[in-house]
Amino acid sequence: MKKLFVVLTSIFIAASAYGLTNSTLIDFALTGNADNLQAGEGDTNEVVPVAENLYNDNWVVWLNESARLTENRRNSYVTNVDSKGNNGAWEAGKVLGVRVHFPLAAWNSYALVKPVYELEMYGGADGTKYTEGKGVIHNVGEIKSISSWVYGRNYLISYFVNLQNEFGELKSYPMGTVYFNGWRQVRWENREYLPNVRDRVLVREPLYPRMIPSVKLDSLGFYRTKDTKGGDFITYVKDVTLEYDVVVVDFEEDIDDEATWQLLKTENDRKQAIESARIREQAELRDLEQRRIGDGTAADQGAAANTGAADTGAAQEQAQ
């Protein structure tokens, strides 16, 4: 906990002192290997294990309401795919394979590829359950760019990376289309980013207590316009990487605010409890549904699990 809640200083001072940081938000070579997703020390009582939520085969495809027909839902899913390493760009390993069955009719539609359960921003014993390439990055200031290795198959489909911040606010970042063949690193650039400190508006920021700005992966979005042919769409994703300014500067202070007041720990525990309760509810509903259809075939069970997650996402969207 202490590691997570170090003293905050101004974002501008941090940016000038430390420069830009590159971190991998999600690496599907990592999540495609179950051995990399074992629970850490102190996380044995977690509601949903990391492996159950993040293993590539367990991700789901959620279609928008007008596209959520039975055939489309049944034929939209993900799988764990072997990659040869893009001619040595990375080690041979796993990537996320995505199949979306868009409506054949000429109307706009989209698909969201996401984990079974929403990622916990503050999960785990020290808030790092989903960090280090598993979907969460702490200490994120202004984002300069987002890049992603994606394998195209000449589909005129737009690709988006959807992120949530520490307040639960959702923002979509357009990565361009996947209208190409083979691997390509697509990129979103922040046109308002000012690399020179002299060009920035410098202000003093309150230091304590203040939660560390963080981001987590909400979903990967694929958007198809009505002018684009419907039916099957295939793509593969290797990773998502962020380039950003850090906010937290870890240096020695005369007084340890957090040790004295523990305000950040209290707020973190509160948010962690809310996240755990929400995920526990989803897990129980899925478990009950799985028992109800337990006499079906394995394929039917997989389709039902994907459909159940889509229904949960729809309910959350309507509630908002």
UniProtKB/Swiss-Prot annotation:
The flagellum consists of an outer layer composed of two sheath proteins, flaA1 (44 kDa) and flaA2 (35 kDa) around a core that contains three proteins flaB1 (37 kDa), flaB2 (34 kDa) and flaB3 (32 kDa). Residues 295-320 have a biased composition (Low complexity). This is Flagellar filament outer layer protein flaA1. GO terms for cellular component: outer membrane-bounded periplasmic space; periplasmic flagellum. It is found in: Periplasmic flagellum; Periplasm. Residues 290-320 are annotated as: Disordered. Its main location: periplasm. InterPro entries: FlaA, FlaA_Spirochaetes. Component of the outer layer of the flagella. The gene is flaA1. The lineage of its organism: Bacteria, Pseudomonadati, Spirochaetota, Spirochaetia, Brachyspirales. Residues 1-19 form the signal peptide. It holds the Pfam family FlaA. Disulfide bonds: none annotated. It comes from the Bacteria. GO terms for biological process: bacterial-type flagellum-dependent cell motility.
